[in-house]
């Protein structure tokens, strides 16, 4: 059962963290599993409270790609570093971070040289577009 809880830190936070995309049914993350991508978080409340690790779409991770349990790498203190979940058929996905703030490479202060105009988060939006065309 999914529930929203107050985050551990009670201040608004806006910063980059890393997420490792999990294998899931989410249509948004097709062919993205195991990618580790920086992403913006920006919120003052909310952390994911999930009793089981089913349908997890991604986890906050540290620089060694281990699940981050504590602030600041897990900015809201979600259990098991859960950043989001999807429903059983993958058509509904909810997540705390903001991929819309990081889908263009120019939205980052620094990016790897192998990124083109779009960051890896653009694939999430492209997947949604392709799903809607079917």
What are these regions (language model features)?
Residues 1-10:
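Single conserved hydrophobic/aromatic residue that forms the stacking wall/gate
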């Amino acid at each position: 059962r999914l529930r929203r809880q107050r985050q551990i830190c009670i201040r608004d936070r806006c910063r980059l963290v890393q997420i490792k995309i999990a294998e899931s049914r989410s249509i948004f993350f097709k062919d993205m599993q195991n990618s580790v991508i920086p992403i913006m978080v920006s919120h003052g409340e909310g952390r994911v409270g999930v009793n089981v690790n089913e349908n997890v779409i991604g986890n906050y991770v540290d620089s060694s790609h281990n699940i981050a349990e504590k602030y600041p790498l897990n900015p809201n203190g979600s259990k098991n570093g859960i950043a989001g979940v999807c429903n059983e058929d993958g058509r509904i996905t909810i997540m705390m971070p903001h991929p819309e703030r990081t889908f263009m490479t120019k939205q980052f202060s620094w990016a790897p040289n192998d990124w083109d105009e779009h960051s890896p988060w653009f694939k999430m939006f492209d997947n949604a577009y392709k799903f809607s065309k079917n």
